[in-house]
Amino acid sequence: MNKQIFVLYFNIFLIFLGIGLVIPVLPVYLKDLGLTGSDLGLLVAAFALSQMIISPFGGTLADKLGKKLIICIGLILFSVSEFMFAVGHNFSVLMLSRVIGGMSAGMVMPGVTGLIADISPSHQKAKNFGYMSAIINSGFILGPGIGGFMAEVSHRMPFYFAGALGILAFIMSIVLIHDPKKSTTSGFQKLEPQLLTKINWKVFITPVILTLVLSFGLSAFETLYSLYTADKVNYSPKDISIAITGGGIFGALFQIYFFDKFMKYFSELTFIAWSLLYSVVVLILLVFANGYWSIMLISFVVFIGFDMIRPAITNYFSNIAGERQGFAGGLNSTFTSMGNFIGPLIAGALFDVHIEAPIYMAIGVSLAGVVIVLIEKQHRAKLKEQNM
């Protein structure tokens, strides 16, 4: 494997490992500072909004100033963010930490993806991006597991460790990464407004609505999950880490071994509908579960439906996009970010009203998604009849 690509993969792994590390300790951390579910929602939303705003600028600066420089700046910001959260004793410091963290993600991700595109031969580009996705998932899966055990020593330790990982990634980037002589910068063209009139906007309405609605519901549930289990059955950081890591492993296994097989027998819309119904059933079981082991077992399988929906929607976008793959990818990313910003805000406020309220909201949103899919399938059937 190319040495630079290995370093880029390692950087991405460290960043997402660092993000995952802190998930199990958030409930203890927030209670220690006397913060609420609404506060957690604000912290998560601040990260998402900051990343959404900075990402376009991060990509542009990476093209103009060099991707290595932007990656290194992003890694330093990541470490600063984690250290600030580790020493923070009031909400203002934590909020500033999350804003800086979002900025770091908005710089590192465009820089890394752009550099991988620059240094990858055309026949290996898709494979290299596939590896990047798998490495991101690996960081998310291993992070909570490691963070939960670190929290047995101190609930601030995972934040210090994440910050140290950022510094390590920064040093490796300085020493081992080099900007290529030829980059993809010249491949970016100036937006021509007349091209927008050639796009069939109607075909994107359903996937855009689905993306917004589902990212809204899923982020609302996932944001509050650690706090939910801690309050409902008194899960410790170690328990939360086992639940989330187990759920991540099961979700990844289903993505790797079963997603392609399901796609051979179902259309994307049909598969999304069934995945949503599966999620509704599991979420209802979660509402009625009150024991340690029942919630642990549900935690292992609750994320499967969500993990299957995401690639199905991406695949659906891609299939209807035709030659507008970049445009479709941009729409998908934009409306996912919007849902990730709005969802935690509302879920946090609902959690303070009733512990089960965010779950009810996720159930309602999932059912709304099923209705949207059914309406779209019916509309497609009518169009097919008219064209016959």
Swiss-Prot record:
PROSITE patterns: MFS. NCBIfam families: 2_A_01_02. This is Quinolone resistance protein NorA. Pfam families: MFS_1 (PF07690). One of its GO terms (molecular function) is xenobiotic transmembrane transporter activity. The chain crosses the membrane at residues 5-25, 42-62, 69-89, 99-119, 129-149, 157-177, 201-221, 239-259, 269-289, 293-313, 331-351, 355-375. Involved in quinolone resistance. May constitute a membrane-associated active efflux pump of hydrophilic quinolones. It is a multi-pass membrane protein. One of its GO terms (cellular component) is plasma membrane. It comes from Staphylococcus aureus. Belongs to the major facilitator superfamily. TCR/Tet family. Keywords: Cell membrane, Membrane, Transmembrane, Transmembrane helix, Transport. Its main location: membrane. It is found in: Cell membrane.
